Amino acid sequence: EPAAPGAAGAGRFAAHPRVREALERRNDRIARFWLRDPARRAAPVEELAGRRVLIVDAEDTFTAMIGHQLAALGLEVTVRRFDEPYGFEGHDLVVMGPGPGDPRETGHPKIAHLRAAVTRLLDERRPFVAVCLSHQVLATLLGLGLARRETPNQGVQKEIDLFGAYERVGFYNTFAARSADDKLTHPEYGVIAVSRDADTGEVHALRGPGFASMQFHAESVLTEDGVRVLAEALTAVVRSSPGGLLPG
């Protein structure tokens, strides 16, 4: 069958060294993890390998990507929607996932559920990580203010200071927690480190005893070293958990 008109020319254009170089440059600042063959993504971390992790899906397609990253780190992954039956028992770690919604609408069924779940994790000292919407919920429970951004972040890559390390990460948020300080002390949950924008006070991430959170998406293709960033957050949670990993 004859080639479609212009197909040969288009093929030659795509194969041109300068075109290929330009296309490769576009990939310089995105996550290499997602460019690898799935069979070559495994990178188990000793402190995490074999642990059981529950992801609570708050209606976000990014949840599946988080699952792939956690599996690559050697964790045994279970995913449950926020509105279906699940339990924290039987899991070593919990990831409260991202999702659409206004975290200020505490009467909304999903927001109410996330608030109750995060409160229980905090009170029971269960090791967990909260992402995006769940991060915002955690921030409000810790007493931080929350505001709508003038311009939403919808697939915006930024370089941030993440607890002393510069990371290029992807943001997808309409709301943001704010803090005037790099540290806050909660009467029940202890001292919490705050990664934030020094100019605006927008909170990028939190780390406390047995928990961590991030406003950005470590699983996004826009987060260059997302798997490492996620692994470091989980490892910090394991190491700082007041009672270690709970038996179930």
List where the protein language model places each region.
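RNA-binding accessory domains that recognize and position tRNA/RNA substrates
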Residues: 1-61, 185, 219-248
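Short, mixed-charge, low-aromatic patches
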Residues: 19-23, 70-72, 183-193
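Short amphipathic alpha-helical segments, especially helix-boundary/capping motifs
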Residues: 40-44, 90-92, 134, 206-210
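Short low-complexity stretches enriched in small and charged residues
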Residues: 47-60, 86, 127, 163-175
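Flexible gly/pro-rich beta->alpha loop and the following alpha-helix that scaffold active-site loops
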Residues: 52, 60-131, 136, 142, ...
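Secondary-structure transition/capping residues
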Residues: 74, 148-149, 241-245
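Residue-level detector of alpha-helical recognition elements and their boundaries
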Residues: 78, 109, 152-153, 248
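Pocket-forming structural segment of enzyme catalytic cores
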Residues: 115-120, 124-131, 136-228, 232-236
